[in-house]
A protein has these predicted regions:
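"A position-specific structural signal for the A-helix of alpha-solenoid helical repeats
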Residues: 12-13, 48, 54-55, 90, ...
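Helix N-cap/loop-to-helix boundary motif
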Residues: 1-8, 42-50, 84-92, 126-134, ...
Length: 171
């Protein structure tokens, strides 16, 4: 039926597919419907609800509404920390997205703080040489640059480059 949890899962996947195709308006619409179903069936603080909140927050960010992105990601982070803990990889993904939202809103100090936490989780769970760690290093380096610490930015981006070249090659 229209409100069945499996329908919610399909709506989530379809929303993410639209996001991959660059249609963030459709992504947002499908994820909003999915969120309504998940909140109704699982509750407002269920891990599945948290995952959809993360995706929906990022959809809002892709649409340029960083305030809504931050709000959805903040809710998602609370759920993930409660259910998975403060150092779980899924928590780290949301921390990274929330850090980038804060950066888009111009609060580079908060961006740095959230990305630093995300980096600690990435290094612990994936290792210091993993591409996920490299992506977080890139974002964190840019945050430091926005704060005016170009030496720190250079160091972090150099580490990210080494990881990327190791995993993807120099070409």
């Amino acid at each position: 039926g229209k409100d069945h949890p499996e329908t919610g899962a399909t709506l989530t996947n379809l929303g993410n597919a639209w996001g991959s195709l660059g249609d963030y308006e459709k992504q947002k619409d499908f994820l909003t419907r999915a969120l309504e179903i998940k909140e109704k069936h699982y509750g407002k603080d269920h891990p599945s609800t948290g995952a959809t909140l993360t995706n929906l927050g990022n959809a809002w960010g892709s649409l340029g509404d960083y305030e809504k992105q931050k709000d959805f990601l903040t809710r998602a982070l609370e759920i993930k920390e409660k259910h998975y803990g403060k150092d779980h990889p899924s928590t780290g993904v949301t921390l990274g997205s929330l850090g980038n939202a804060w950066g888009s809103l111009g609060d580079y100090e908060k961006q740095k703080d959230f990305l630093t936490r995300a980096l600690e989780i990435d290094e612990k769970h994936y290792g210091k040489d993993h591409p996920e760690t490299g992506a977080t290093l890139t974002n964190l380096g840019n945050a430091w640059g926005s704060l005016g610490d170009y030496e720190k930015k250079k160091d972090l981006l150099t580490r990210a480059l080494e990881i990327n070249e190791k995993h993807y090659g120099k070409d």
